[in-house]
Curated annotation (Swiss-Prot):
Catalytic reactions on record: Selective cleavage of Arg-|-Thr and then Arg-|-Ile bonds in prothrombin to form thrombin
Principal cellular location given in the protein's record: secreted
Active-site residues (renumbered): 273, 319, 416
Species of the source: Mus musculus (Mouse)
Annotated S-S bridges: 57-62, 90-101, 95-110, 112-121, 129-140, 136-149, 151-164, 172-339, 238-243, 258-274, 387-401, 412-440
Keywords: Blood coagulation, Calcium, Cleavage on pair of basic residues, Disulfide bond, EGF-like domain, Gamma-carboxyglutamic acid, Glycoprotein, Hemostasis, Hydrolase, Hydroxylation, Protease, Repeat, Secreted, Serine protease, Signal, Zymogen
The record's account of how the chain is modified after translation: The vitamin K-dependent, enzymatic carboxylation of some glutamate residues allows the modified protein to bind calcium. N- and O-glycosylated.
Protein name per the record: Coagulation factor X
This enzyme's EC code(s): 3.4.21.6
Pfam families the UniProt entry points to: EGF (PF00008), FXa_inhibition (PF14670), Gla (PF00594), Trypsin (PF00089)
């Protein structure tokens, strides 16, 4: 309650306003002056007091700068200011399906939970392949606005229509453990192929003949320097069972000169240019140390050499070949195939991953000696335009680039023909063949790889062209009609 003195003064003021000749009402300005509220702190000491939200913005009208001085944090200032100026737009909880609401001046923004979209997260997003691979374990494709899952060779689709299951002890694309059971052969497709059709797209050679004499169709064309043959610089040793699809091509002196990828128990994928580097060669699998026997190594003779007949020795275009072995590989520790993917799925899903993995026994640096230890290296995919600008050589549609611009890690001489695989949900798929590069781990230069997705049909036809380990002596195919 006010004191008697204060009440008396108020009565005097009000009485003076009602002097004779004056109206009952007064203008707003005079009334506000009479009822004006005195500030709690005087103007001088106000500047020295720490900002107080109640004093500055509730008892008085505050400015944005005053709010910022109170919170001393830009984000908290903006959050409070938007509510202070026009109220909390999120108060009515406009975001549906557990969406998070963020208030704004004159509006709000919803951050939707996975599977929902729209201004208020009111729209359900169909789980197509672009969203978490449609929940498929392996291959995903879209049909009539729905997802269809499928599996790599050697797997079958589970009852849920999503998972891929294999009963084989060593299915493709899985790192191996200590299991030593024999696996079944993997089929790449259920469809049949006419042998003559297959022969139109590749060259067939017998390794008992001289590959140099049979393959020198482009002998007069200029070749890249041997220093440009890709080729692991950097990286680390492949742990036990970690690179089971690695194959090694060995010459008559039992020396490794190129790599390869195990596709199934009879077939090895490699680079076409490797076929020019030895008169006769065999394939060794299960090797992690060429100077030490570990019990999993096996050597296989080659029955048929299938080289793409469009291979260009001057550009390394179509640098791909398939080797058929005389005897089947027994899958075991450190010996298992990598999976062949589906083309569209591989290009939209696998090759949009950040990295792939290369492995081999190549040189440990550009002028160094061959490694006796199997090494692996994770390499990032490189944007196509970036790669093309990094070299004066042609980067065709049958190639892709991977590696580091400046980091001293790369594939190198001796790794040629070896695997480039990409991991997806703990399964490894063949995505490339080590092909060529300018030196090893040079700054601004990348490794160039044969793009396997371009040749998946060719690989499938090549593996179907012979049906048993005792195929008759192959012949060299003519050019495509």
């Amino acid at each position: 309650m006010g004191s008697p003195v204060q009440l008396s003064l108020l009565c005097v003021v009000l009485a003076s306003l009602l002097l004779p000749g004056k109206g009952v009402f007064i203008n707003r300005e005079r009334a506000n002056n009479v009822l004006a509220r005195t500030r709690r702190a005087n103007s001088f000491f106000e500047e020295f007091k720490k900002g107080n939200l109640e004093r500055e913005c509730m008892e008085e009208i505050c400015s944005y700068e005053e709010v910022r001085e109170i919170f001393e944090d830009d984000e908290k200032t903006k959050e409070y200011w938007t509510k202070y100026k026009d109220g909390d737009q999120c108060e009515s909880s406009p975001c549906q399906n557990q969406g998070a609401c963020r208030d704004g001046i004159g509006g709000y923004t919803c951050t939707c939970s996975e599977g929902f979209e729209g201004k208020n997260c009111e729209l359900f997003v169909r789980k197509l392949c672009r969203l978490d691979n449609g929940d498929c374990d392996q291959f995903c494709r879209e049909e009539q606005n729905s997802v269809v899952c499928s599996c790599a060779s050697g797997y079958f689709l589970g009852n849920d229509g999503k998972s891929c299951i294999s009963t084989a002890p060593f299915p493709c694309g899985k790192i191996t453990t200590g299991r030593r059971k024999r696996s079944v052969a993997l089929n790449t497709s259920d469809s049949e192929l006419d042998l003559e059709d297959a022969l139109l797209d590749e060259d067939f050679l017998s390794p008992t003949e001289n590959p140099i004499e049979l393959l020198n169709l482009n002998e007069t064309q200029p070749e890249r320097s041997s220093d440009d043959l890709v080729r692991i610089v950097g990286g680390r040793e492949c742990k036990d069972g970690e690179c089971p699809w690695q194959a090694l091509l060995i010459n008559e002196d039992n020396e490794g000169f190129c790599g390869g990828t195990i596709l199934n128990e009879f077939y090895i994928l490699t680079a076409a240019h490797c076929l020019h580097q030895a008169r006769r060669f065999k394939v060794r699998v299960g090797d992690r140390n060429t100077e030490k026997e570990e019990g999993n190594e096996m050597v296989h003779e080659v029955d048929v050499v299938i080289k793409h007949n469009k291979f260009q020795r001057d550009t390394y275009d179509y640098d791909i070949a398939v080797l058929r072995l005389k005897t089947p590989i027994t899958f075991r520790m450190n010996v298992a195939p990598a999976c062949l993917p589906q083309k569209d799925w591989a290009e939209s899903t696998l090759m949009t991953q950040k990295t792939g993995i290369v492995s081999g026994f190549g040189r440990t640096h550009e002028k160094g000696r061959q490694s006796n230890i199997l090494k692996m290296l994770e390499v990032p995919y490189v944007d196509r335009n970036t790669c093309k600008l990094s070299t004066s050589f042609s980067i065709t549609q049958n190639m892709f680039c991977a590696g580091y611009e400046a980091k001293l890690e790369d594939a190198c001489q001796g790794d040629s023909g070896g695997p480039h695989v990409t991991r997806f949900k703990n399964t490894y798929y063949v995505t490339g063949i080590v092909s060529w590069g300018e030196g090893c781990a040079r700054k601004g230069k990348y490794g160039i790889y044969t793009k396997v997705t371009t040749f998946l049909k060719w690989i499938d036809r090549s593996m179907k062209a012979r049906v048993g380990p005792t195929a008759e002596t192959p012949r060299t195919a003519g050019p495509p009609n």
